[in-house]
Every structure is written in structure tokens, then in C-alpha cells.
A protein has these predicted regions:
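Eukaryotic RNA-binding helical-repeat scaffolds
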Residues: 2-625
Length: 625
């Protein structure tokens, strides 16, 4: 047998004479003749080969291992005690374990040839480049070799020594590998020093893939470093491709890092792209936009224009379901996109999963949009959706409520959720869902009375729903309070106006008042409680203290006032969301005149006189409708 050092000398001499060094494919050493007693060239030469081969063969998979047998692999790996062969054998074994061709514990561990291969690797690791060390460690851990074993610790110690001279991409590879393997003190030390090296060398961040991986590992870095990472993304965004920008946005969405300047930069450069992403990529971008609560109108329009021509080509119902979920959750009202998704669903209604059908109904209701094929679409959907289709009662309630919003609900569907057996199950529902469930039941109950005249089934006992309170956000209250302050110049409280009304129909009304046919304010208390009554009737009080239902005198108008904020409108339009459209329709059916104050018309910074005149004009306008 030729001594190891003589083999090494021979390789070096052949390299000097112009012989081609062994080729490197990914993390696997490919040797033309396993029987040849060859050895690795100098580390510098090998690193160059790694970089060149990675560029030429990026994405190349390992050789097909399906035809290889374990004894053959182990025999080749230990031939001539060549550590090139040993490393190749290690990677091949790792692939075989990953593809479940062999079981490491059962078929490999303890095998004499395997132990011999490990011994060769253990002795040779000190001569390995960072790329080779990292590949060996990844394969060892993938095989299931104990983290406390000598060979694993030898490779990790070699990586620890190489951290300072390692390339930045290799540092990130060490980071991602060790995050998942923190079983020993040495592994923890490698991770700690790797993080310190990355933070110290942050100026070397250049690739979009590197930044994406760093974002996914954000919990391990300081806030200062993450700020620098954000800066690098914004600095390099204009050099990135559309897919790279999309992946970075998705990474931010996954970790829910709402770094607004970064998201804006990514959205800006994505919207400028002339090429198109695939439907799956666009679905991922939509999901990220939804998670980040960043419905940038320009980016959304780009997504819609990219997606609409490709919808018909989608064969994966789950992808369509995911897109529908995002549209509904964002309340994004894009008629073109909703139309093609509705057509896609109609053509496949008999084969679509029930989740897709319910997602479409919920999305259309959320956006307050009626598709042009509604007359043919909804019968196909409702024929497949029934209470037994859902394991959770709340899911069926969502469907019935959505059909109510869309004006497509049937008496049987309403009866199924207003039945005492269904209503009595509300206390069993999760606490955070109860308010929403009760509000939807109130909406449905009101629709049964006011919109569905043929309904004769059970109704809610409103006395059990007196504690249902709708709360507004701080920004919403700010606009509403400003409007009320201006309105008091026309309608002094409490004689002429009720404010902040929690109705019996599950709708919050900012104000209620009464006027004559000319718009002159009348004392609202003279005409009973109106919407203030949880019974929903116009209730007055007798001198004895008992209540009495009062009929509205002729010529008197009851007026309900809504202050609409940004969140009350569907994204991408000045159309109210479905729930608000339903509230408006229910109030109209109750005989109310409606004053609607949208945020984009009302100027909080405007002069008081002008605002009062604006409100007065809106009141008079409502009386002639």
C-alpha cells in the first residue's frame, strides 16, 4: 500500500504539471475513478474549484443513488484509504438515508466499513476547506451520527477555526445548520461565534438569498444588526430580480417584521417589474402582504394584472383557496380578479373542495362584491354546502352570514343557525369568537325579519343579547367624535340626538336623530328610544313608568348617521365592505333615512363653519333619497 503522504505528494506534483483536479459537484466530491489513490489539492485550489463548480452546476442534484447498493458504496468509500472517496461515500450515504433507501441505525451504524470510512474522515478533516467541512458536517448530522461523537466534534472544531476566513455565504450556511443542532456546548459555541462574525461583517451582505436567510434567523440577531440588514435590502433592492424581491417580502411576512421603509422599497421595485411571477409565487406574495397588513395599492394592482391571465391555468384548488383567503382577509375588492376566480370556481364547482367554495363565499361577502355569474354560481355552491359539511359550527355560521350579506341566503339556512339548539351552543365556543358569533346572529336575525319576508322559522330572544357591545378603534373614535362635536351645533344633545348606539340588529350607529320633512331637527326623545331600544321598536314611556311602542308620526323622519373610516371600505375602492353594506340595508328596511360621512369627504382640519355646513347639507340630501 502506498503511504498517505506519498499519495498526497503525487497529487500535488500532477497538479503542478497541469493535471485536472478532482471535480466538485455541490457538496459532493465526484471522482472519476474511485479506485485511484488520489488526494485533495491545496485548500486554495479547492476553494476556487468549489466556487467555479457551484456557479456552473447550481441546482445540480447528487448522482442517482437508486441503483447503488450499500456494500458497494461502503467498499468504494474505503478504497485505498482515500479521504476523497470517504467524503464522497459520506455524501452518498446521506442521500440514501434521505431518500429512505437505507436505515442508518439498522443498516449502517456499527458496520465495519462505515467505521473505517469515519476514521479516514476524522483523520483528514484538518486539511479540509470550509466548504468541505460544512458539507461533511451536514451529511454526518443528516445521517444521525451522534453530535458528541469524535468525528462530529472534529469537524465542528475545524469549522470554528475557519470562521474568520470563511466566505460570507458559508457563514450563513454554518448559521442555518447550527440553529437546528444545539445539542452540545461546542455546537452552541460555533453558533455564537458565527453570529458574532456575521454581525461584524455585515457590510459583506450582497445576495438576496443571503438576506432572506438572515431574516428567517432574525431571533438570533441584535436589533442593531437587523436595522443594518434593512438598510442593505433598501440599498440593493433596485439590483434585484422580481423573484428575489418577492422572496424577501415573503421572508418579512413569515417573521411578521413590519419594517415599513423596507416593505415600501420592495413594493415599489416589484410594481415596476415588467415580467410576471407564477401563480404560486403571487399567492405567496399575497399571503405576505396580508400578514404584514400592507395593502399597497400599486403592488396589489401589479399582483392582480399578473395573476388574472394565469388563473385559468391553475390546477391546484388549494392555491386558489389560499388566494381567496388573502383577498377576503384583506377586504380587497378587485372586480377583475374576483370575476376570474368566480368563473374558475363555477367551472370546477363539482370537484372543488368545500373549503374553496366557502372561501369564495366569505371573500365575496367581505369585499361586498356580487360576481356577474352569481345566478349560476351560487346555486352550485349552496347545493354542496350544508351544516353537516362543517365540523365547526362557527364555519357554517360564517357561510350563512356571508350568504346573507350577498342576498343569497335561504330560509332553511337561516333557520339552521337561529334554531335554539344552535344558539344554545354559543357558550361552548372559544371566548375570543363569541362576540363575532353573536353579532352575526343578530345580523341574520334582522335580515330574516326585514329582508326575507317568507321566513317563518325561529328568531332570537333579544333579551339574551343585550350585553353585545361593538367597540371602535382609537382612530375611528377620533373621527366620529369630531363629527359629533360639529353636529352638536345643529343637534344639541341629549334632547335632539342619541349617540353611540348599540342596536338590536348587530350594527353600530354613530348617531340617531329626528327631523321634519324640511330637515328641521325635532326632539328625538319625543318619539321613543328608536334604535336605543334593544327590542328594536320605537319605545316610549308612560307616566306610570311602563313602556309603550309608539308609531312614528307622519312627516317625521328618523335619521341614522354613520361615520365611515378607512377600515370600513374595501381595499382598492370607495365601496363599503360587505358587513357595512348589510348594516345600511337593514337600517333602510327599518325605515331610516341615512346620513353617511366617509373619511375621504370629511376634513377634520377644516374650519368648523365649513364642517357644520357640510353636515347640514348631508342631512338634507338624505331626506330626498
Amino acid at each position: 500500500m502506498v503511504p498517505m503522504w506519498q499519495g498526497l505528494l503525487g497529487v500535488c506534483v500532477r497538479a503542478i504539471r497541469g493535471h485536472t483536479p478532482p471535480r466538485l459537484w455541490g457538496r459532493e466530491l465526484v471522482v472519476t475513478h474511485l479506485s485511484t489513490a488520489a488526494c485533495r489539492s491545496a485548500p486554495e485550489q479547492q476553494d476556487t474549484a468549489v466556487k467555479q463548480q457551484d456557479q456552473q452546476d447550481e441546482g445540480t442534484k447528487h448522482e442517482n443513488t437508486e441503483t447503488l447498493e450499500l456494500p458497494t458504496v461502503l467498499q468504494a468509500a474505503t478504497a485505498k484509504n482515500s479521504y476523497i472517496n470517504a467524503f464522497k461515500g459520506l455524501h452518498t450515504l446521506s442521500d440514501m438515508v434521505s431518500s429512505k433507501q437505507v436505515d442508518f441505525k439498522k443498516d449502517v451504524e456499527g458496520d465495519e466499513q462505515f467505521e473505517k470510512m469515519i476514521a479516514v474522515i476524522d483523520q483528514s478533516v484538518i486539511r479540509c476547506s470550509p466548504t468541505t467541512s460544512l458539507g461533511a458536517l451536514r451529511s454526518l448530522l443528516n445521517l444521525g451520527v451522534d453530535s458528541n461523537s469524535h468525528v462530529v466534534q472534529s469537524v465542528q472544531m475545524q469549522l470554528l477555526w475557519q470562521l474568520r476566513k470563511m466566505s460570507f455565504p458559508s457563514l450563513i450556511s454554518v448559521l442555518t445548520l447550527h440553529i437546528d443542532h444545539q445539542h452540545t456546548d461546542l455546537q452552541k459555541r460555533v453558533l455564537k461565534e458565527c453570529i458574532e462574525s456575521i454581525e461584524r461583517r455585515w457590510v459583506e451582505m450582497r445576495g438576496a438569498g443571503e438576506m432572506e436567510k438572515l431574516y428567517t434567523c432574525h431571533t438570533h440577531f441584535s436589533s442593531e444588526f437587523l436595522g443594518r440588514l434593512d438598510d442593505r435590502v433598501m440599498e440593493l433592492a433596485d439590483t434585484m430580480t422580481y423573484p428575489q424581491l418577492a422572496k424577501l417580502l415573503c421572508a418579512l411576512g413569515t417573521i411578521k417584521r413590519r419594517a415599513t421603509p423596507v416593505i415600501r422599497a420592495l413594493a415599489f421595485h416589484m410594481a415596476k417589474q415588467t415580467d410576471r411571477l407564477s401563480p404560486k409565487q403571487l399567492g405567496n406574495v399575497l399571503f405576505a402582504v396580508n400578514l404584514l397588513s400592507f395593502p399597497d395599492p400599486v403592488l396589489l394592482e401589479k399582483i392582480a394584472s399578473d395573476l388574472m391571465p394565469q388563473v385559468e391555468e391553475i390546477n391546484n384548488p388549494k392555491l386558489v383557496g389560499s388566494i381567496l383567503f388573502c383577498l377576503g382577509h384583506m377586504r380587497w375588492r378587485h372586480p377583475g380578479l374576483l370575476e376570474v376566480l368566480s368563473e374558475w370556481t363555477e367551472k370546477r364547482a363539482s370537484d372543488c373542495p368545500l373549503a374553496n367554495l366557502s372561501a369564495l363565499v366569505l371573500t365575496l361577502a367581505s369585499a361586498g362584491y356580487e360576481p356577474s355569474n352569481g345566478d349560476t354560481l351560487f346555486p352550485l355552491i349552496t347545493s354542496r354546502l350544508n351544516p353537516s359539511s362543517f365540523t365547526k359550527k362557527t364555519a357554517w355560521l360564517d357561510v350563512v352570514w356571508s350568504l346573507t350579506v350577498l342576498g343569497r341566503v335561504s330560509s332553511e339556512q337561516i333557520e339552521s343557525v337561529l334554531h335554539p339548539s344552535f344558539v344554545s351552543s354559543i357558550p361552548l365556543i372559544e371566548q375570543h369568537l363569541r362576540l363575532g358569533v353573536r353579532l352575526k346572529l343578530l345580523n341574520i336575525n334582522a335580515a330574516a325579519q326585514l329582508l326575507l319576508h317568507s321566513y317563518s322559522g325561529p328568531q332570537l330572544n333579544l333579551a339574551e343579547f343585550k350585553d353585545v357591545i361593538i367597540t371602535a378603534g382609537q382612530d375611528e373614535r377620533k373621527v366620529s367624535q369630531h363629527v359629533m362635536k360639529m353636529l352638536h351645533n345643529l343637534l344639541p344633545p341629549p334632547k335632539y340626538i342619541y349617540e353611540g348606539i348599540q342596536t338590536s340588529i348587530g350594527v353600530y350607529v354613530d348617531a340617531e336623530f329626528a327631523t321634519d320633512k324640511n330637515g328641521k331637527p325635532l326632539p328625538v326623545q319625543d318619539f321613543g328610544e328608536g334604535l336605543m331600544s334593544k327590542s328594536g321598536e320605537y319605545v316610549g314611556t308612560k307616566s306610570s313608568g311602563s313602556t309603550v311602542t309608539k308609531k312614528l308620526p307622519e312627516g317625521v323622519n328618523r335619521v341614522a348617521l354613520f361615520v365611515w373610516n378607512y377600515s370600513d371600505f374595501a381595499v382598492g375602492s370607495q365601496e363599503l365592505t360587505g358587513i357595512n353594506k348589510l348594516g345600511v340595508e337593514l337600517l333602510r328596511k327599518k325605515g331610516y333615512k341615512l346620513v353617511q360621512i366617509p373619511y375621504f369627504e370629511y376634513n377634520m382640519k377644516g374650519k368648523a363653519l365649513r364642517n357644520v355646513q357640510y353636515l347640514e347639507g348631508k342631512i338634507k340630501e338624505s331626506l330626498v333619497v
